């Protein structure tokens, strides 16, 4: 919960939260077959908002402190400035920081998905933690020659998963032009440290051998298991993007649209992490709607039509659910009629009206047309 306090310098808000997780999968999803998992986390929040210069300038500053029992305290400050020279225009500049503690899955997961075993990473993996862990390509190269060569194997280690940290700068404008055009523009840049994603490798049992004075390597092929492990990026990862929103009001008609650009930057690094960004680079919507139209003796007619386009993107899930989600577009439409005397509205509509079957996540179900009829009565 939280509380608000009125002060001479502004409005102060303080709050706190506590959450306890107690999963019980009996070893089917989490590593809790022999030992129960309990995970506690809590946080404290405080912020103050001040308005000065006849409320032309609004300054907001906050700080948040979080603690997960498996990690140290984390502090997340943030601040923003909003300039409103008049009642219809707002310019905003903000800096924010945040910490994302690893989820239960990223800490405790142990699930055999067939092609790979999906595991969390509370204690680390690999050579530094007493395990044989190699890259998939090097394991393939190991078995290519008639006499396998241990030197072909590339061993590596993954440190225990750490909280993901992000710092974001944003600038934006929101306002109206001639009372008919509403605009919302923004640009952001985010820098991630310890970005959480996944790494894939092979684990196996093996022993060094000496036969007739010759040193060898006995790799038990039957013990090979492919693991997908939660991991942090070795390099900083940045994202940036922009969004544009517009509403054009023409009497009872409205034309609206929005566009967003989101870019993940992993170039010029040799970081092996697989980032679970799962966000299309380009996405936009265009809509046309009307309210309470009148046609001769018929009134209370409303409608809306919306076109959505989403660019293709790489979706990262479990190994069998990782791949490209193709670009897709849909058209939604709705027609409604209100009956004032009986306080009732009837609506007919369809999402994806042209039945353009598409995936929104890799490995997910195909999504097609959905039609509906609704009757609403106002009490």
Regions found by a protein language model. Name each.
Residues 92-96, 254-261, 273-379:
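Conserved C-terminal beta-signal and adjacent last beta-strands/turns
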Residues 1-71, 184, 256:
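Face-selective signature of the C-terminal outer-membrane beta-barrel domain
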Residues 52-53, 180-316, 376:
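Gram-negative outer-membrane beta-barrel transporters
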Residues 124-226:
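Membrane-embedded beta-barrel scaffold of Gram-negative outer-membrane proteins
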Residues 5-11, 52-57, 87-88, 178-180, ...:
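Short loop/turn motifs that connect adjacent beta-strands in outer-membrane beta-barrel proteins
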Residues 1-5, 44-50, 79-85, 171-175, ...:
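Residues on the lipid-exposed face of transmembrane beta-strands in outer-membrane beta-barrel proteins
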